[in-house]
Amino acid sequence: MQAAAVDNPRLPLRPVLVWAALVAIISGLGLIPFYAFVPDLSKFTGNLPAAQLALLGIAVELAAVGPSLAAILVAWRMPGAGGARSLFRQFRHWRVHPIWYLIALLLPIPILLAADVIWMALGRQSLVWLTVPGAIPFTIGAALVPPLGEEFGWRGFAQPRLQRRLGVFVPGGSKLFLPSDVAQTYIRLISTAVIYAWIYNSTGGSLPAVMVAHAAHNIHSGFIPGASVDPRHLGPLLGALCYAAAAIVIVLATNRGTLTRRLQASHRALRRGGT
């Protein structure tokens, strides 16, 4: 059932356009308090009135859940969008081969460590190889809120509708239109989107597997933070480039139309041709 949703060319495109507009609106609303209270995030120390801090917290959470919130609203209220149940049904598709959960859980580790190795090879020795995050509740929140708040939208709603018409890279490339601070953020977002699309399609549309991958990235990023002194933010750029390298390997090793194994994609094409 879920695999059919991934490959279904009949899903209408209009709902995803409405979804994209709604995501942009929600993200914009989430940015307003930051522009009002913290125009320069590099100088943010947390020394703000309690009401402003609370508003910033609400804004962060609103932006974090924007993609999924928009997807649920559009699927629920817009004719032809499939209904909210069809979206939540993908969350029940958790019975996939265990190797995909291992990949989702462990893949960020070699990628992040590779960035640290490159950092050392460049002669920059101020590394923190493994730390326990000081804000454990924040780390737990980062492992839960972004996967739940984003993947119902990006993977569960947008990807099946976009990839058959415009290509599997469009859902990830569309993140270029999200507001961000630096180029490395776009590189990382698009690269992780390719990786998550690969997992999603290869598992026949398993949102739990993708959410594990998303959560694993956030958790491992907290435990393997990399450079301790990095005024030019070279460390995050190296991490983003390593994610880009992993995404390129996936693209080269799979069918570029679906990011699934070439043999698997050929068998699907033969089955469609036979019917």
Give the location of each predicted region.
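Membrane-helix interface linkers and caps
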Residues: Q2-R10, G30, F34-L102, I118-T131, ...
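Hydrophobic alpha-helical segments embedded in the membrane of multi-pass proteins
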Residues: Y186-I195
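Aromatic-anchored segments of alpha-helical transmembrane domains
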Residues: A24-I32, I109-A114, V170-P171, H214-I224
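Juxtamembrane helix-entry segments on the extracytoplasmic side of multipass membrane proteins
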Residues: L127-I140, G173-I187
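C-terminal membrane module of polytopic membrane proteins
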Residues: P39, L176-D181, S202-T275
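Alpha-helical transmembrane segments
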Residues: V16-G28, A64-S68, Y101-L112
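Membrane-helix interface segments
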Residues: P12-L17, G83, V96-I99, V132, ...
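Membrane-interface helix/loop boundary segments of multi-pass membrane proteins
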Residues: G149-V170, A197, N201-S206
